[in-house]
A protein has these predicted regions:
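Nucleotide phosphate-binding/pyrophosphate-handling subdomain across enzymes
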Residues: 2-13, 21, 25-32, 110, ...
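Phosphate-binding loop of NTP-binding sites
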Residues: 5, 28, 34, 51, ...
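Conserved N-terminal Rossmann-fold NAD(P)-binding element of oxidoreductases
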Residues: 12-17, 444
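NAD(P)-binding Rossmann-fold cofactor-contacting core
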Residues: 33-49
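Conserved beta-strand positions in the Rossmann-like core of class I SAM-dependent methyltransferases
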Residues: 35-38, 141, 387, 419
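Beta-strand->loop->alpha-helix junctions that form or flank phosphate-binding loops
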Residues: 39-40, 58-61, 97-104, 143-146, ...
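Short acidic/histidine-rich motifs immediately flanking catalytic phosphotransfer sites
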Residues: 68-72, 161, 437-439
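C-terminal helical cap/extension that packs against the catalytic core
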Residues: 377-437
Length: 466
């Protein structure tokens, strides 16, 4: 495997440089005086941003884009082996590396590499940790899987020896990483188009933890079923727990304001450390914040900086994001696409002022919908009214013969108020006819369901959130 050393800059060419992760890695390397070029199928705001920094971006992709002098080529999983540039790089014998491998090699250049892993909560928790590090003037480099408001995007290039990133389990990509601190938020069944079952997922997380160096740290949710399994045979690696019971970091005396934003008393190793007030909603974010606090305290950050940063942190794009109002009802958008995430979002919404709670849910991938259908039905049933859109295919073809109507039939058999409306214009028409003043409507899913709320808020009389 090709090593990346910041003190030995190379010429690196990115095939698919316009992706949110690839563009961030390109920017980090440019800051470290690497020569960076790249290509993509079309221009985008991200490619235009890279060009404004001085990176040559070729559109479209072509074998002629592989110039003499390129020393390493990086590609994404979306690039097929019959891609012209991929073929030309192979023909020339230029070393190649996947995006995940490059990310892992980059983090080896930092003394402290913090990786946040878990079935859900990664983007929010990574952003919370980033907010705390910035409040404490630690000048971190941050790469996150969503839009973090205080850095104006998904990337912050710092000059310190701290690197912060999400670590995704899909296709075992986090097995390419080299963390010194690993955060494990939760471990549940997901990505069942790749993993065989929950046991294979658990083994994948265990392998990730074992990538820590002997003096590394794992911060783990004590509420994960059989969490002790992940801590077996860790040698001298340090362990910090958060959650309930006798965890090292716990939240007690929890209360919520009018908008479901929690406050709690923080206990560290059983000692009362005072009140923490969050500006994000829901019980799940209490436990996300506990993991962030644990990391920050390990790095020697004061409670004052931690509390200030967490109070200021208002969330990331598409995480219980208040979008606006129309006809007197409120529209919120949320990325939840796993049953546990849906349950957490609905639990937060129940604490939010409303008459009726409506969920407009777009299932994400056929394999996930089929494998977790019973769980989806149970989670969604906690709302008053549910509208199901067509399944968002993402990377899949419908080889399992399933549709949102199958989920509707299951939910109807359980006496849930549910409607299957395939297309967005019909969904929007139904909403305008049936959702009333004082209701709360959440567009939910990891696909393009956000467009429903955007369309409604573009109508005359709508009020957008600032």
């Amino acid at each position: 495997m090709y090593d990346i050393h910041f003190d030995k800059p190379l010429w690196i060419h990115f095939i698919g440089i316009g992706g949110i992760s690839m563009s961030g890695l390109a920017e980090i390397l440019l800051d470290r005086h690497f020569t960076v070029t790249g290509s993509d199928a079309k221009t985008s705001p991200l490619t235009e941003h890279l060009e404004s920094l001085g990176i040559k971006v070729f559109v479209p992709q072509s074998r002629q884009n592989i110039q003499d002098g390129v020393e390493l080529c990086v590609y994404t999983a979306a690039i097929s082996e019959d891609n012209e540039e991929f073929q030309e790089v192979k023909r020339r014998g230029i070393p190649m590396m996947s995006r995940a491998d490059l990310l892992g090699r980059i983090m080896q250049n930092y003394a402290t590499a913090i990786n946040v892993a878990g079935t859900h909560g990664k983007t929010t928790t990574t952003s919370m940790i980033g907010e705390i590090l910035m409040e404490a003037a630690k000048d971190p480099t941050i790469t996150v899987g969503g839009m973090m408001k205080d850095i104006g995007g998904n990337l912050r290039v710092g000059q310190s020896d701290i690197f912060l990133a999400e670590a995704c389990e899909y296709t075992n990509s986090f097995h390419s990483f080299f963390p010194s601190i690993a955060v494990i938020l939760n471990v549940e069944a997901d990505h069942l188009d790749f993993f065989k079952d929950i046991n294979e997922i658990r083994d994948s997380f265990k392998t990730f933890i074992e990538r820590l160096p002997e003096d590394g740290l794992v911060v783990i949710n004590r509420d994960i079923p059989h969490y002790e399994y992940f801590l077996e045979d860790l040698g001298g690696r340090k362990i910090i727990t958060f959650g309930h019971g006798d965890a090292d970091y716990t939240a007690n005396f929890i209360s919520y304001d009018h908008y479901a934003r929690p406050s709690f008393t923080l206990f560290e190793h059983g000692e009362d450390r005072g009140k923490v007030t969050l500006s994000v909603t829901g019980e799940h974010n209490i436990y996300n914040s506990l993991s962030a606090i644990a990391v920050a305290r390990y790095l020697g950050i004061s409670f004052e900086d931690i509390k200030e940063a967490l109070h200021r942190f208002s969330g990331t794009d598409r995480r219980f994001q208040r979008k606006g109002k129309i006809n007197g009802f409120t529209i919120i958008d949320d990325y939840a696409h796993h049953p546990q995430e849906i349950a957490a979002t609905i639990a937060a919404a129940q604490k939010y002022p409303h008459r009726k709670l409506w969920i407009v849910f777009q299932p994400h991938t056929y394999s996930r919908t089929k494998a977790l259908m019973e769980d989806f039905a149970g989670a969604l049933a906690q709302a008053d009214e549910i509208i199901l859109a067509d399944i968002y295919a993402a990377r899949e073809k419908n080889t399992v013969g399933i549709s949102s109507d199958d989920l509707r039939k299951l939910m109807l058999s359980q006496n849930t108020n549910v409607y299957y409306i395939p297309d967005f214009p019909s969904i929007e028409k139904y909403i305008l006819e049936h959702v009333k003043e004082g209701d709360l409507l959440i567009t939910m899913g990891a696909g393009n369901i956000v467009d429903v709320g955007e369309d409604l808020l573009s109508l005359e009389g709508a009020e957008r959130e600032e």
